């Protein structure tokens, strides 16, 4: 169409027509279409904004005022016919869309097509800008053919020089390569701010076998380095972008360029159509759509023929181009993935024009994504380049965007590196050129263009206002990843600080790994012993780790932490923390830790987990550790003698931070605490610590007190309790029979008390009392060891023999303490005398109860319920006083209580009552009515005689302990009450005699297993030791006794009682330290009636 072409447009259907008019005679302006609604009748009929209305339904509009035109339009009801005059500078949207569709259809036949639509921001004032597009042939004959086509009026120029060469490898038949030159020439004739144009070219290059990606160089642009001093002077700027294939031969070739001048308001379509001879050339189409009131004739250039088809019409554009779209199609090549389009979602500014890839088969989801992107783009463009830049919404948007950018931290991620890797994988990467024409505008487009950090394409920026052409190469930015951008603010500082601290922490960890020297220097004498112990413990910890993986308990975790630090100092602490971290915090019910352990080994693992004290007493440590016997005797005997006595090696604070938290994980600053989440600990573990701090019952001194017979019945029926060593192999069965949940509860209570022992002597006492609870779990056999170490300190030295015997009754510690032979005998006598026959060892039995009852404060702590304090203790005391009112026979009750004091653990799990020892239980015997209960007096007739002897000595205090035990029946250990072999009864009488003799006798007897009562007890886990029939536990005891007690104990009973108790404890694992929670020990009150055959 020529300039001022007239077009007749008809619409039917009645109002609304979907367009708005402006002007009129009164305004001395022609009547024009001011606005057209999308998807309206006007837009569908091809009406465009800026069209001049000549007539409406045959009524000329030149002499009509605007109100008259409105009346005329309102009078039209059915059909509307308009004659419009369209200026040559504009082109109808319908025609544009048709042209685009035709072009795209034509291009898709060739293969992969990429299209991009970009916005060109109009300038406030018009200016003349010229673009020069010049395709070039590298061969001379082709260059000569370029003149064959008709020239566009005054817009075609010839040039030679650097060019944008796009020369894909041609078939061998082709004599040369064809390069495509894109020369952008700008002619500025006015100072007014110009339009902002962003042009992105993505050209996919065909790659043959030997082809490789082209290298892109950006030469030239020297002409435009400095702004034009004279604003009125028109000047040209040319930017040459050369893309030269790497496989290009060195042979020279001629370059000639044809420049097509495009005025700012014209449509240019340059198509390189591959013909038979040019199969390797891709097709490029660039469409410049004109803005309102502008019309452009397409200038069609066929690269193969090098001819320009259509002339460029003259005429000045009133506004710069509003739309630029181009498509690149590569024929005969594989579809190339556009790396940028894949990463559009990660780019910060999504309103930038992108390459929309048109595939032959596009999924519905992809189409939806494209639609969503186009919508977002349109919204973003409206915001960044609004028709009215001073509108309130646009200003608010700009303000908020500036604020957001100011307070937004730059991501320090490695997305750039990942993107490079992705691009390398793509078969044929396309070379992308980005040309940005920047003019002064309020849309902040320069921010949008230059802020795309993820883009590694070449960007050429033209700023017509300043006269500068900024060429920014955004090539591989991997080297810049090391440098943080210039960011300020709290976030950046926090990040930097945190990274420094993390580096320091990692460095410290590495140093600790390399040199495991303890941070705190210890005395020279202690250092050697500690080193040996540490090495041993490390080995032990490894074994424990493997064994305890099947059965881990709360006690195990907490004690393991506390234990290692004590022996190792800080290095030990870090080691422990690592172990703790390795140990899963799963709190689901599991078999007790000791259950998996082997008879001899279990003790060591338990000790490791439970407490440092336990480690020393345990037999394996003795044999493995180098320290002199004195140290061992000191470590073992001193705990027994005085609970308050700390172990010889240095101990950190009871639960110092190192125990629970790795020092490296302690974060000081608040920011770091926020950025690094705190290490999570299980709810149960936290509850355990809390309970340790504030137990319902505070047992200052564990006493050996009779357990309610109900508990004894439960455990006996299960046949799980092997006293002392007996608990080793039996523990698995015992724990399982109790039930996973019950076991967990028992462990948790013991763990609470255990935790303190490693910390301080008092904790040690608590641990001893809690250790009985541990016995419920395999802790008794292998795991109790940790518990027992606290027990040693708990027992008083003077009453150590009796107390230790009771403690030995506890299965867990017996292995740890081989020394207490007297103790072992005592506990055996106690239970035997009470249950089996008082005649055999009435005195020992009495003495044990006496210690328990009479010395609750001193001896009681270790054997009996310790002096209880706290609200729970008060409640129990009240209940006890109430119970006494209803006791049928107070003497009988007292007798039973005294009998109960004899440690039940002394009865071996394998021990069975002989006819001598027991009387058959009544047919209707109910454990609830056991002597410990007031009503039990009626049913406890057979054992009444025994209680009478032992019971008188102990009166109401044993009842208290029993009451406590009653309230915590779930904590009883069935393993304490296992009666299997009848051999035990023989061992019992002998054992009492052995106890009288001396610890040495016990030691001697233990290794021989058959000869002495102690040995049968240990080996057979007979009545006293309640060691089920475990031969290995005896061996373990013998082993422990020989290293520990053999060297230190040889002295004699006076000096050896403690050692003796320790060795016997190894053999007699049953130590009768009992807290209310240690129902296992309480079970000591064995009644013949309760016995199961």
UniProtKB/Swiss-Prot annotation:
Expressed in heart muscle. Isoform 5 is specifically expressed in skeletal muscle. Phosphorylated by PKA, and by CaMK2 at multiple sites. Dephosphorylated by calcineurin; abrogating interaction with YWHAB and impairing nuclear import. Phosphorylated by ILK. PROSITE patterns: PDZ. Residues 6-88 form the PDZ domain. Residues 222-233, 359-369, 663-674 have a biased composition (Basic and acidic residues). SUPFAM superfamilies: PDZ domain-like. It is found in: Nucleus; Cytoplasm; Cytoplasm, Cytoskeleton; Cytoplasm, Myofibril, Sarcomere, Z line. Residues 664-916 are annotated as: F-actin bundling activity. A motif (Nuclear localization signal) lies at residues 398-406. PANTHER family: PUTATIVE-RELATED, SYNAPTOPODIN-2. May self-associate in muscle cells under oxidative stress. Binds F-actin. Interacts with ACTN2; ACTN2 is proposed to anchor SYOP2 at Z lines in mature myocytes. Interacts with AKAP6, PPP3CA and CAMK2A. Interacts (phosphorylated form) with YWHAB; YWHAB competes with ACTN2 for interaction with SYNPO2. Interacts with KPNA2; mediating nuclear import of SYNOP2; dependent on interaction with YWHAB. Interacts with IPO13; may be implicated in SYNOP2 nuclear import. Interacts with ZYX, FLNC, ILK. Interacts with BAG3 (via WW 1 domain). Belongs to the synaptopodin family. Has an actin-binding and actin-bundling activity. Can induce the formation of F-actin networks in an isoform-specific manner. At the sarcomeric Z lines is proposed to act as adapter protein that links nascent myofibers to the sarcolemma via ZYX and may play a role in early assembly and stabilization of the Z lines. Involved in autophagosome formation. This is Synaptopodin-2. It comes from Homo sapiens (Human).
